[in-house]
Regions:
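Extended basic (Lys/Arg/His-rich) segments that typically form rRNA-contacting surfaces
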Residues: 1-225
């Protein structure tokens, strides 16, 4: 299940040979560097890195420095083992073996290898993992799709959840009850997406359908099956 770290650029549309319109998500995936290789009996995985992070340095008195985290010496040392001059901005781990499928072919990679979009081909099925859009504190109508109360005959509880459980027995709210709360900003994996096009020159992958996350959000695209 080799994969690659990418950035969601947005959505567009493609047309197949029959003239049908296909909605697609465009994912930009610059070549990833293999930072570490895990190979045990129970786990075979790669640690991938992409982008570049600013390094720490001594600041002159009164000098204004840009905001954001800077890579420390441990991160730089880890990156130099893979032949990089700067620490990667984004690091993710990708599992190579498939649990429950011992016959699956496991690709071999070494520290410092590059992985680009050519690992995918049109027609393949992939799964995309990302962080959904954060929507803050929301009520049950938006968060869980409740129907709400009546809109007429003097009702004033249009978007309230209603009863949240029995009274005397058990005298508590059952765990897992759908109630208002924080909505979004969660890790989500969308499976069964088809690769429609691969543009190796521009490091782009066109995937049919929508993927989780906002524009410019970090995603991980992995082969499925």
């Amino acid at each position: 299940m080799i994969g690659i770290i990418g950035k969601k650029l947005g959505m567009t549309q493609l047309f197949n040979d029959a003239g049908q319109q296909i909605p697609c998500t465009v994912i930009e995936a610059e070549p990833n560097t293999v930072l570490a290789v895990t190979s045990t009996e129970k786990l075979k995985a790669l640690q991938l890195g992409t982008g570049a992070q600013r390094t720490r340095r001594a600041n002159a008195k009164g000098e204004k420095t840009p905001k954001g985290n800077r890579a420390h010496s441990a991160q730089l040392g880890h990156a130099r083992k893979a032949g990089l001059d700067a620490a990667p901005r984004t690091i993710r781990s990708v599992r190579l073996d498939e649990p429950g499928n011992a016959k699956a072919e496991i690709p071999t990679h070494a520290v410092g290898d590059k992985i680009d979009v050519t690992i995918f081909a049109p027609g393949e099925t992939v799964k995309v993992t990302g962080t959904t859009k954060g929507r803050g504190f929301q009520g049950v109508v938006k968060r869980w799709g409740f129907g709400g109360g009546p809109n007429t005959h003097g009702n004033t509880k249009h978007r309230r959840p209603g009863s949240i459980g029995p009274g005397t027995d058990p005298s508590r709210v059952i765990k897992g009850k759908k109630m208002p709360g924080h909505y979004g900003a969660e890790r989500h994996t969308q499976i069964g997406l088809r690769v429609e096009k691969v543009d190796a020159e521009r490091n782009l992958v066109y995937v049919r359908g929508a993927v989780p996350g906002p524009t410019n959000g970090i995603v991980v695209v992995r082969k499925q099956g």
